[in-house]
């Protein structure tokens, strides 16, 4: 597949994802939270050894992708409430060890993934992060979305700007921006009647604060 893409003088990145806490595999997450609509269902919290294994799996996947001819990696990631998003957001990260608490601790797993990929694949191997710039959620669980963005309980744009600056300082080569969460799927998977390019106002604000490339998802239907 990568050979076919390269034949047209194009580049191809592999998107590496881990959705734990948003699926039923082992019912494990960053902290003990309810991953489903039923608040009586609780996940178990990953131990530090289990977190290290998850990080190693990201790194091994990147190594395999490079062997397969992919030109870089998108860590998928810090949006929609997936594993790294659960680390990054205080509403889902209640840990008291080095992976919880302050913002830099909540980003530690994302940093360790990057460091590992760069160590194994080379410092010049591109690694970008996919990140939701605003969660549009008032709480956890089905029906907790906020169309107007008020009473935000997830990630705000202001916090995303701080995260973007930290990701750049860690060595990430770019950020793919979108908005929304499983609690606010209207934004995460915007329907056809949402304005095209509706994420651009958010990504434009982030771009003012970093020098790495900013990519944008969300109703970017027309390249012209």
List the model feature ranges, each with a label.
Residues 1-224:
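Flavin-dependent oxidoreductase catalytic cores
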């Amino acid at each position: 597949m990568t050979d076919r893409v390269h034949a047209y003088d194009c580049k191809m990145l592999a998107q590496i994802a881990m959705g734990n806490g948003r699926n039923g595999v082992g019912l494990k997450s960053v902290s003990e939270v309810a991953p489903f609509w039923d608040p009586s269902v609780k996940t178990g919290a990953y131990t530090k050894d289990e977190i290290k294994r998850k990080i190693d799996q990201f790194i091994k996947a990147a190594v395999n992708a490079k062997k397969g001819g992919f030109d870089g990696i998108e860590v998928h990631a810090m949006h929609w409430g997936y594993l790294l998003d659960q680390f990054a957001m205080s509403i889902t990260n209640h840990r008291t060890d080095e992976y919880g608490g302050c913002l830099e601790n909540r980003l530690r797993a994302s940093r360790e993934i990057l460091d590992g990929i760069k160590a194994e694949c080379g410092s010049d191997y591109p690694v970008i992060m996919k990140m939701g710039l605003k969660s549009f959620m008032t709480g956890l669980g089905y029906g907790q979305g906020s169309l107007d963005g008020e009473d935000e309980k997830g990630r705000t744009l202001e916090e995303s700007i701080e995260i973007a600056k930290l990701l750049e300082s860690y060595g990430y080569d770019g950020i793919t921006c979108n908005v929304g969460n499983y609690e606010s799927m209207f934004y995460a998977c915007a329907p056809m009647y949402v304005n095209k390019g509706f994420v651009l106002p958010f990504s434009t604000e982030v771009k003012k604060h970093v020098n790495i490339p900013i990519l944008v998802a969300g109703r970017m239907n027309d390249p012209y």
